[in-house]
Amino acid sequence: MTLLLLPLLLASLLASCSCNKANKHKPWIEAEYQGIVMENDNTVLLNPPLFALDKDAPLRYAGEICGFRLHGSGVPFEAVILDKATGEGLIRAKEPVDCEAQKEHTFTIQAYDCGEGPDGANTKKSHKATVHVRVNDVNEFAPVFVERLYRAAVTEGKLYDRILRVEAIDGDCSPQYSQICYYEILTPNTPFLIDNDGNIENTEKLQYSGERLYKFTVTAYDCGKKRAADDAEVEIQVKPTCKPSWQGWNKRIEYAPGAGSLALFPGIRLETCDEPLWNIQATIELQTSHVAKGCDRDNYSERALRKLCGAATGEVDLLPMPGPNANWTAGLSVHYSQDSSLIYWFNGTQAVQVPLGGPSGLGSGPQDSLSDHFTLSFWMKHGVTPNKGKKEEETIVCNTVQNEDGFSHYSLTVHGCRIAFLYWPLLESARPVKFLWKLEQVCDDEWHHYALNLEFPTVTLYTDGISFDPALIHDNGLIHPPRREPALMIGACWTEEKNKEKEKGDNSTDTTQGDPLSIHHYFHGYLAGFSVRSGRLESREVIECLYACREGLDYRDFESLGKGMKVHVNPSQSLLTLEGDDVETFNHALQHVAYMNTLRFATPGVRPLRLTTAVKCFSEESCVSIPEVEGYVVVLQPDAPQILLSGTAHFARPAVDFEGTNGVPLFPDLQITCSISHQVEAKKDESWQGTVTDTRMSDEIVHNLDGCEISLVGDDLDPERESLLLDTTSLQQRGLELTNTSAYLTIAGVESITVYEEILRQARYRLRHGAALYTRKFRLSCSEMNGRYSSNEFIVEVNVLHSMNRVAHPSHVLSSQQFLHRGHQPPPEMAGHSLASSHRNSMIPSAATLIIVVCVGFLVLMVVLGLVRIHSLHRRVSGAGGPPGASSDPKDPDLFWDDSALTIIVNPMESYQNRQSCVTGAVGGQQEDEDSSDSEVADSPSSDERRIIETPPHRY
């Protein structure tokens, strides 16, 4: 039997060896394949067909093809085996392909056999063949016009080869389907023709007297004869015979604050109707007189603006608001400007005399009045009065000053469009000097600011922040000197020395009322902000910062300014003049004239705009005339800044912290941020449930504040028990004003947000020792731009934690309210040991609070039961010899009470342990509190010691 099995075993071993060595050849495929797949289809047609051959065939496994592998990044195809024996395969797309996304795909393919057995061992792979698959286009897209509406204009009586061109595009990928083969006008009976390229021409001459606007519809066809999904509309306007004018400008120009420089006429061009010109002059005028005082300026108050610009202090207001200390302005007519500043109207018969010396005058005495170094600053609106002669002067200010050497005198007057400054250094010996300026601002009846710097013999006049040197300087030695007595008058001046005798009998009241014998040269116009600063001059930079206009016409494209072009801008930037000799160069220059407003929060509204043009032609007989252009700039409403106050809104501290010298900070972690929210375009594919009407985003900006207020929510402060504290030294160093009352505390003055944060974090709340206050709420709010923008109201609630052993209660009955406080007070028997614990855990979770209340209530119940038991015991012990005043009613023996002070003897350790067990069951992790309590329990009375418990007063 053994001999028979051996040959079988040897045969099986030989067969096994022969199978392992049967897979000798690799599969073979073509080196390259070309494939075609139709768009939106899966099957790829290959040339040649996909077949893999193996020389090991017909052996099983070794001669069979098990599959194909594709190699390449992101190949959207897959290869499948159709017949393992023949090696036939198929390439197909994983999903329908899109020709518009990708027209061709290239990758490699490799075949592999089934190896030497079912487990695929010793599998062999073929070489890698390259496969090129082209996606055949399907005419799935219709032509689409680039514009839905085409407009053009033609002049009457002309035939045009091309009026305009319409254009359509096709989204298909192949040239056959993506090209537009022809266009067609669908509207019948139109005098127009369109070619295959979309060019439209007129077939007859059009007349302005006939139809002035032609409307018709145009469609397009691709080379697959697919028509456009949406047709295009064409409008052709017929214009009359050419008239010289400006073309391509918009009447309304919108300006968004913060946009910088905005071109006013970006597409403007001059139509000359082929008339040759040799000179063109255009003037652009921007009208801003209706905006505040003549133009858009900083919206801060005068005082805040002086601080921002770095102006020195010490100026004296000569025309203050009428009041007890400034009664000299009471007789003038008072108005208010758009920025709420005070304006005085002088009607030509009024003047005011400013008192010298004293608390309400200029300086402490005449010797402190103006010297030969001073700055006069004022706003003036003045026009030429029709009923007054052009030769009559009007006095703005007239002043005679007494000094150590004698008297000096000066006056500032207007005379038509001239402004004059007369200075007499010394009436006794020196000759007067008169400085003259001729300015159109003086008589244009618009608001302008004037600042005059005197540093004799130098005098500089600033108008709207722009300096002007005197046009003429006269040595006037023939005029009569004024009377020698100190006086300061605004709106007129007194007569010369020869009339002094007539004036001696007149008092100051009569003088200011305008006695014709003593007062002359009255001023007719408006004055505001009239101040003087003696001994030191305002610098040019400060004056420019304070009063220069922040809006105006602008031109910066000097580099590309053509040859022969001239540009001139007036000092106030309200008038710009262009001059040139070439039309195209002139058009280019005018297209770069811009409006600019440097204010972040510009004053919204309309600024009228006017363009006037004068031309000179080679032929005067046929010279053209260019009509005036009028439009307006609309300054849009600026995005308001959002001032956000944030920080800790609620905190609790022990009473000893509030009773300290410095109190407790109210806003220790205050954060002030300023941001601007502006509208952005919402994405169309944005997932939003509902209707999207506005999408906004916020950009944080660096900004200033001009005031903050801390007020009380509820009753005012009681000065005898509480107060608000703030370091006045730091406020004075920064030029801020502090007002502290029982109802509020205000800080006024322009400073950065960082400085206000630092100051407000130092605001403290202090209590007097023993004050029984438990809760206070404070409201903080800030503002900016002279109160134009305000912050949110940030409310802080403060809890004062009192120890219950610090106060006494007159009642002998203990109640749950006497053991429970909003600040989570400890039980009275541990009041002296739980201050630190209550401070650290003033905010106990609500569940723990409920358990504590239950425990305390249980404790109170036990105390009440103890009282009843003590009372019964006391009755049995006392018997008939009770205390005086005891009840002797035999019907109600249990209602006997002792009128003396109630004394309760309890075990403090037992009640404290009961309460601690309740808290431990509700709130874990209070190890710190337990340690502090345990450390103090060691010093508490022992169980056999007695302790007197006094109930606290009821304060709720």
Swiss-Prot record:
Signal peptide limits: 1-19
GO cellular component, one term: GABA-ergic synapse
Effect of H874Y: In a colorectal cancer sample; somatic mutation
Membrane topology: Single-pass type I membrane protein
Covalent S-S links between cysteines: none
Primary location recorded for the protein, binned into one broad class: membrane
Mod. after translation: Proteolytically processed under normal cellular conditions. A primary zeta-cleavage generates a large extracellular (soluble) N-terminal domain (sAlc) and a short C-terminal transmembrane fragment (CTF1). A secondary cleavage catalyzed by gamma-secretase within the transmembrane domain releases the beta-Alc-beta chain in the extracellular milieu and produces an intracellular fragment (AlcICD). This processing is strongly suppressed in the tripartite complex formed with APBA2 and APP, which seems to prevent the association with gamma-secretase.
GO terms assigned for molecular function: calcium ion binding; cell-cell adhesion mediator activity; enzyme inhibitor activity; neurexin family protein binding
The Cadherin domain, residue ranges: 29-145, 146-246
Cytoplasmic side: 869-956
Alphabetical list of InterPro entries matching this protein: Cadherin-like_dom (IPR002126), Cadherin-like_sf (IPR015919), CLSTN_C (IPR045588), ConA-like_dom_sf (IPR013320)
SMART domains cross-referenced by the UniProt entry: CA (SM00112)
UniProt keywords, alphabetically: Calcium, Cell adhesion, Cell membrane, Cell projection, Endoplasmic reticulum, Glycoprotein, Golgi apparatus, Lipid droplet, Membrane, Postsynaptic cell membrane, Repeat, Signal, Synapse, Transmembrane, Transmembrane helix, Ubl conjugation
Region (Disordered): 916-956
Job of this protein: Postsynaptic adhesion molecule that binds to presynaptic neurexins to mediate both excitatory and inhibitory synapse formation. Promotes synapse development by acting as a cell adhesion molecule at the postsynaptic membrane, which associates with both neurexin-alpha and neurexin-beta proteins at the presynaptic membrane. Regulates the balance between excitatory and inhibitory synapses by inhibiting formation of excitatory parallel-fiber synapses and promoting formation of inhibitory synapses in the same neuron.
UniProt remark on domains: The cytoplasmic domain binds synaptic Ca(2+).
Protein name: Calsyntenin-3
Species annotation: Homo sapiens
Gene that produces this protein: CLSTN3
